[in-house]
Structure formats: C-alpha cells, structure tokens
C-alpha cells in the first residue's frame, strides 16, 4: 500500500507541471502555427488567467499555505481552463477579464470610447497595420 500511495503522490505532484505548463506550451505553439484564430484566443486567454492566478498566489502565499487542498483545487481549476472540451480560459476571459477591463475603461467596447484615460494605450500605443520595427 505504501508503494501505491507513493505512486499516487508522485502522479499528483507531476500532474501540475504537465497540466499547467507543458500541455499549454505545446498547445500554444500548435495554435500559433494553425491558420485559425480561435485557438490563438483560447491560449492567450489561458496565459492571461494563469499569470493572474500565479500573481495572486504570490501575494496570498501565507494564506494559501493554510489551505491543505489548495494544490488539488488549483489543479482541477487549471485542467478546466486548458481542456478543449470546456474552453474554460476563453469563458473566464470573456465573462470576467474583458468585462472588468471594459468597466474600468481599459478596453473600448465596440460602440463607445473609454470613459477613463486608457493607461495601456499610453504605454503601448496602437500601431496601424501592426508593422514590425527593424533595428
């Protein structure tokens, strides 16, 4: 029974990097090489949400240490984000991230201009045609 428990523990520990990093990295490269834009949006949404989750963990690290099932909950949540059957990352991005950015005037809606100064626009001005800069 000890060997089985050791195996399960190792499997549980290894699942995190595979689900949270390796599979998303692989799928992101495949998406970038495909002609469709839908998969690009799914994986860009994933990396935005995963980055936010990682930053939140850094900030709340001392609190999270007291939650014994945190790693398992995070693993299940990230699996929901990455599995193509669920498209959780796109769902969270569209329902939460995009709406919050619109609400705070960071993103322009399709019919109106931002009500507040767009700080991201001042940092990263939009360039027509997305031309590359040569150095």
UniProtKB/Swiss-Prot annotation:
Main location: membrane
GO biological process, one term: negative regulation of autophagy
Entry coiled-coil feature ranges: none
Record's bilayer topology term: Multi-pass membrane protein
Tissues where this protein is expressed: Predominantly expressed in flower buds.
Induction data: By abscisic acid (ABA), cold, drought and salt stresses.
Transmembrane segments: 11-31, 42-62, 63-83
Ribosomal protein as UniProt keyword: no
Keyword check for Transferase: no
GO cellular component, one term: membrane
Key words of the record: Membrane, Stress response, Transmembrane, Transmembrane helix
Compartment(s) where it occurs, according to its Swiss-Prot or TrEMBL record: Membrane
A Pfam family the protein falls into: TB2_DP1_HVA22
Similarity comment: family membership: Belongs to the DP1 family.
Protein name: HVA22-like protein d
Gene source species: Arabidopsis thaliana (Mouse-ear cress)
